[in-house]
Amino acid sequence: MIESGIRGSIINISSQMGIVGGKKRTVYCASKHAMEGFSKSMALDLAENGIRVNTVCPTFVETELTRPFMAEKEFKDYVLSRIPLGHVGQTEDVADAVLFLASDMSKMVTGSAIKVDGGWTAI
């Protein structure tokens, strides 16, 4: 992008666990916290080139990968108890945040983490 003189947006998919910690998720949380720091630093490094860098931090999203976990009542109840809006995310929720960050509507947004978490990190 720099060599071509292209201004734009880099969007990294992180996790709500990049904002908070999670029991029995030490390595996962560490990797997502690293992504948050990396993205903030890259936002500063690339700003002079007109390149914005942000992250999208979703909560649990209903996918083929998460369906088996959500089938376990105890796990699902725990997850839902942490989400004030009362439901897990959908892939469209994440896609909408990415679309916003990729568009000119976010031309003043860089170094930010867009939390698509139903309020998990507000608790």
PLM regions and their residue ranges:
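Residue(s) in the substrate-gating loop at a strand-loop-helix junction
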Residues: 15
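Short, flexible catalytic-loop segment of classical short-chain dehydrogenase/reductase
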Residues: 36, 57-68
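Catalytic Tyr-x(3-8)-Lys segment
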Residues: 73-93
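Hydrophobic alpha-helix immediately C-terminal to the catalytic Tyr-X-X-X-Lys motif of short-chain
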Residues: 34, 38-42, 46, 56, ...
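Alpha-helical segment proximal to the catalytic Tyr-Lys
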Residues: 3, 44-48, 107
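C-terminal substrate-recognition "lid" of short-chain dehydrogenase/reductases
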Residues: 52, 87-116, 121
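Active-site loop immediately N-terminal to the catalytic Tyr-X3-Lys motif
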Residues: 7, 20-26, 48, 86, ...
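Active-site helix of classical SDR
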Residues: 6, 31, 39
